[in-house]
Amino acid sequence: MEKAIQRQRVLLEHLQPIRHHTHDHSSSLTTSICAAGDSAAYQRTAAFGDDVVIVAAYRTAICKSKRGGFKDTLSDDLLAPVLKAVIEKTNLDPKEVGDIVVGTVLAPGSIRAMECRMAAFYAGFPETVPIRTVNRQCSSGLQAVADVAASIKAGFYDIGIGAGLELMTVDNIGRVQQRNTKVDTFAQARDCLLPMGITSENVAQRFGVTRLEQDQAAVNSHQRAAAATASGKFKDEIIPVLTKIVDPQTGKEKPVVISVDDGIRPNTNLTSLGKLKPAFKNDGTTTAGNASQVSDGAAAVLLMKRSVAMKKGLPILGVFRSFAAVGVDPAVMGIGPAVAIPPAVKSAGLDLDDIDLYEINEAFASQFVYCQKKLNLDPEKVNVNGGAMALGHPLGATGARCVATLLHEMKRRGKDCRFGVISMCIGSGMGAAAVFERGDAVDDLCNARVSNNNSFLSKDAK
């Protein structure tokens, strides 16, 4: 933490107006290092009110596709409750929202865009509030949040919503229908068409991730998710959804309220997982038990300028600090987080040691284990409430879901947890990561403004 404070002190000196004093030019932190790294960065400023902050982040429960709680729910009815929640729970006038961006993957783009627009109307938004979708596959929900943060930072609007939605009960993972003959002459293009399970096997084989390591990761995920559920942690982030369940035999509809993740198996153990056969290769190590679940779910995140949140008296859940998207070899797309996290952390002016919590999507245990080992992460900081192997992975919603899970956990931990990272691999060979700061983690070295009446920095300066 001392290193982080020193970096922030030097950073603020770079960003302050020129004064008649000098600072230590021998510092290892320079303006070039402070600037955004690689291809993506989120510039800090010394203007306290210029921070992009999160004031609300909620999700639905995550349910098993085709047989879970949302199997008979329409996509627009799944998205509407979380859009409504971020407005109602903050008492925000919906007409003040500048844009809504929804990450979504599998449904045809134009159809899903209309469904999202319909959901906004159900949630109480007026016709004047626009909405669009974004698709960067498994990172789509996080990309939506990053897009809104960037738009607020650019001054396009002051308030926006980044959301995510996937109804895998209805929208199945598709395949390219008309294969281009050129693809066989471009190895990486060909590998974009590999089934995700085969890329998992490639990671396990290339980097020596064993079946036992993968199964143990799955056990840990289920145990942590079960413990979080039992302790009531997820109640802070889950919005109950009133929907229906249709009896497949009689067709009779039964009204239900879905408020608990239904994919968690508390009794998962190495013995039971060890009996499962490989799902993609006869001699493989990836099984139905150590891969993410196919799921239905939605999530929404309300972002705004800090100055707007302060004016409205809204509590600040988190601060959006940086974002990075990177490309990797499509044949081992699962390594994406190991490549994306370092530049995202660097862009925030931090080191990996400064990060207190991680939410890394568990697309497959093979890639999850590899990324932890590659970055030498403390397992006690990663997916402390379980991940996609236990909760499920509704593709477009996962990134936004992780924002809700991470920020509520950081809030619970308080002063001992300042910075958090969300990351995931992306089909066709990419990775994405974002850095967040706990909302109340402000001091004279962070998010401060220069007081005109005093010679010191104060977060309360006018």
Curated annotation (Swiss-Prot):
Its EC number is 2.3.1.16. Transmembrane segments: none annotated. The keyword Acyltransferase applies. Disruption phenotype: Strongly reduced benzoic acid (BA) levels and lower benzenoid formation. Keywords: Acyltransferase, Peroxisome, Transferase, Transit peptide. Substrate binds at residue 427. GO terms for cellular component: peroxisome. InterPro entries: Thiolase (IPR002155), Thiolase-like (IPR016039), Thiolase-like_sf_Thiolase (IPR050215), Thiolase_acyl_enz_int_AS (IPR020615), Thiolase_AS (IPR020610), Thiolase_C (IPR020617), Thiolase_CS (IPR020613), Thiolase_N (IPR020616). Residues 1-34 form a transit peptide. Homodimer. Component of the floral volatile benzenoid/phenylpropanoid (FVBP) biosynthetic pathway. Thiolase that catalyzes the conversion of 3-oxo-3-phenylpropionyl-CoA (benzoylacetyl-CoA) to benzoyl-CoA. This is 3-ketoacyl CoA thiolase 1, peroxisomal. The gene is KAT1.
